Amino acid sequence: MQDPSTGPLATQATSSFTEHLQRSRPELLPFNQLLPAGTVPSSPHATTIVALTYAGGVLMAGDRRATMGNIIASRHIEKVFPADEYSVLGIAGTAGLAIDITRLFQVELEHYEKIEGTLLSLVGKANRLGAMIRGNLPMAMQGMAVIPLFAGFDQVAGVGRLFSYDVTGGRYEELEHHSVGSGSVFARGALKKLWKPNLSEEDAISVAVEALYDAADDDSATGGPDPVRQLWPVVYTVNRSGNRRVPERDLAAVAGAIVESRAVAGREA
């Protein structure tokens, strides 16, 4: 009887689920496709994501709008997801591809934990995400790019850390805050003015929501808080206890306070 440790499955064993798919079923990878020559198909695009560090952790928030050209494709899309217990991922770019890559990344981290019996380090997670984005480069060159933000709590260093990426999969650590997507230039301007070291978690949530509010005010592809439809940004915090999605009732209160403060000040927006 053949020893299972020396069989064909064992020889292909790897702690990377993406690598396993690349070897055995490459057609299942979301970024292993080439479009036929011609016009890039119109598809929904996710827009603005913001992230910032605060005392004891890191926070990520995303608006709820997806656009397809000049059309609002969705007002309910979610762009920030838990990658695992101690990290979160935000997506901008081609929505369908971005969501598939997010799901694959979640499985990648879970697979590694099951095979190795331990969590991958935060930098290791960031590097694996970069490799996935690099794998999508052929699609990006055809107009279907995916640009993520990745954040998590480094259990060794005891701090929240934030990583940005370029379209080639290049990984860059951001020490304070960052934003990606069509409204990022406006959100980043707000973050520069509102962020300060050692923010409390409550203040960090307020800063993130206000940055998205400013982005939505000047970028038509970014959706701001919508009290009529009761739609609020998706906000996750990550600290020593793990990740947590901020309840919508808390976000409604934060957004209401921002609007009220601007009304009292007599501001146009």
Curated annotation (Swiss-Prot):
Regulation: The formation of the proteasomal ATPase ARC-20S proteasome complex, likely via the docking of the C-termini of ARC into the intersubunit pockets in the alpha-rings, may trigger opening of the gate for substrate entry. Interconversion between the open-gate and close-gate conformations leads to a dynamic regulation of the 20S proteasome proteolysis activity.
Molecular-function GO terms, alphabetical: threonine-type endopeptidase activity
A GO term from the CC aspect: proteasome core complex, beta-subunit complex
Its EC number(s): 3.4.25.1
Propeptide residue span(s): 1-46
Domain of life (superkingdom): Bacteria
GO biological process, one term: modification-dependent protein catabolic process
Pathway: Protein degradation; proteasomal Pup-dependent pathway
PROSITE patterns: PROTEASOME_BETA_2
Keyword Acetylation included in the entry's annotation: no
Residues of the active site: 47
Catalytic activity reported: Cleavage of peptide bonds with very broad specificity
InterPro entries: Ntn_hydrolases_N, Pept_T1A_subB, Proteasome_sua/b, Proteasome_suB-type, PSB_actinobac
Record bears the keyword Secreted: no
Locations listed in the record: Cytoplasm
Top EC class, one word: hydrolase
Alphabetic keyword roster: Autocatalytic cleavage, Cytoplasm, Hydrolase, Protease, Proteasome, Threonine protease, Zymogen
Cited NCBIfam families: 20S_bact_beta
Function: Component of the proteasome core, a large protease complex with broad specificity involved in protein degradation.
Subunit structure: The 20S proteasome core is composed of 14 alpha and 14 beta subunits that assemble into four stacked heptameric rings, resulting in a barrel-shaped structure. The two inner rings, each composed of seven catalytic beta subunits, are sandwiched by two outer rings, each composed of seven alpha subunits. The catalytic chamber with the active sites is on the inside of the barrel. Has a gated structure, the ends of the cylinder being occluded by the N-termini of the alpha-subunits. Is capped by the proteasome-associated ATPase, ARC.
Family designation: Belongs to the peptidase T1B family.
Protein name from the UniProt record: Proteasome subunit beta
Lineage: Bacteria, Bacillati, Actinomycetota, Actinomycetes, Micrococcales
